[in-house]
Structure formats: structure tokens, C-alpha cells
Regions:
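Surface-exposed loop/edge segments in extracytoplasmic proteins
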Residues: 191-196
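Proteolytic processing hotspots in large secreted/extracellular or virion-associated proteins
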Residues: 20-184, 189
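Ser/Thr/Gly/Pro-rich low-complexity, disordered linker/stalk segments of secreted
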Residues: 1-26
Length: 196
């Protein structure tokens, strides 16, 4: 299911796969024509939420580049929501036209697979986070969460990580963690640089 402006719609299908390491990935693929019809009736500024249930290692929402472009033209906001957090961004921040140029001018937007995912960080990134915490003198109260946006066509992939507007990432505070002990959230770049 996909939620548009707070109303649940049947416009997505979920699939869970397990890799050789036993890590599960749950992917919700949005039905382009169904979502297009729903958005046409909503006007501009709609919020499209892709809720992903379960405790998968990776939770991802997938749309076509054409759907992202359509959402962009309608000033829509995309939200991927999981048990560990949410990723909220205006569709325009994916900048699908620039991505398309990087993938090749002959690539149709409908052939570009846009994936917004929330996952546990890799072992190497977890080590980077732990080192950054040690160097910065802060304590990790909640497990780190990795947020990524990729756009792919065939074997080519473009990572989207720079934005011109505010992009919201939230982390759920697990049971047993005292929220009064949490001062701030910190972004840790792959090189170990931290930002508040």
C-alpha cells in the first residue's frame, strides 16, 4: 500500500528477499499508473508515503524516474517510512533530469529505477561512526541508520546525496532508551566527518 495525503491506496507491492548472509531486504515497488491517477485527483503539494513494515536489514521504496518527474511537476513530497526511521524529501530534490543526463541522454525516464532506502549501515560504516563518536567525545544512544537514494539504469547507478532544500531524516528511539539523555542527532559522512 501507498499513503497519499493520509489516505491508504493500493498502489504498491512489497517483496522481501534474503541474501547469502541472511540479511533481508523489503522493497515496495510503486505502481506508476495507479499512483499517477491518484495524484491527478489530489492537485499539487501531495505527500506520498511508502510505509515499509517488518524489521528488514534494508527497507526500500522504488519508483520510476518518470513517476519522480511527475511528482516533481506536482510539487509532491516523497516519504519512506520504516520501523527505524523516515526519509522525507520533495520529489524535486532527486533532480531526475540531472540524473538522467548522468545515465545517458538516450535513457527514458520510465527506464530509470529510483530507490530510496533506509538500512542498517555496513560493518565498515558502523566502524566509521564508532570512531567519529570516540573522536568527537559523544555517545551513541541509538543504532546508526543509513539513508540512500540511488537511480539506476542497467549496470549504471547514480547516487543522489546533495540537496538544495531541506531533506528530513528521522530515527526512531527504541524502547528502553531514555529520550532525555539524547541531545542531538549527528550525520556521519563516509569519511568520518560529523554534522549536527
Amino acid at each position: 500500500a501507498v499513503i497519499v495525503n493520509g489516505k491508504t491506496q493500493t498502489a504498491g507491492t512489497a517483496q522481501t528477499a534474503t541474501n547469502s548472509s541472511g540479511q533481508t531486504t523489503t522493497t515496495v515497488t510503486v505502481d506508476t499508473s495507479k499512483l499517477e491517477n491518484i495524484l491527478a485527483s489530489q492537485g499539487t503539494g501531495a505527500t506520498v508515503t511508502i510505509p515499509i513494515t517488518g524489521n528488514s536489514y534494508v527497507a526500500a521504496g522504488t519508483l520510476t524516474g518518470a513517476m519522480v518527474k511527475s511528482m516533481e511537476s506536482k510539487n509532491a513530497t516523497l516519504v519512506v517510512q520504516t520501523h527505524s526511521g523516515t526519509y522525507t524529501l520533495p520529489a524535486s530534490e532527486i533532480n531526475i533530469n540531472a540524473v538522467s543526463q548522468q545515465l545517458g541522454t538516450s535513457v527514458a525516464l520510465s527506464d530509470i529505477k529510483v530507490t530510496v532506502s533506509i538500512s542498517e549501515p555496513s560493518a565498515s560504516m558502523t566502524k566509521v561512526v564508532e570512531t567519529a563518536a570516540q573522536d568527537g567525545g559523544f555517545t551513541i544512544m541509538v543504532p546508526a541508520v543509513d539513508y540512500t537514494i540511488t537511480c539506476a539504469h542497467g549496470s549504471q547507478t547514480v547516487n543522489v546525496s546533495s540537496f538544495n532544500a531541506y531533506v528530513e531524516r528521522t530515527i526512531a528511539i527504541p524502547d528502553g532508551v531514555d529520550p532525555t539523555k539524547i541531545t542531538t542527532g549527528v550525520v556521519v559522512d563516509p569519511n568520518g566527518t560529523t554534522h549536527h
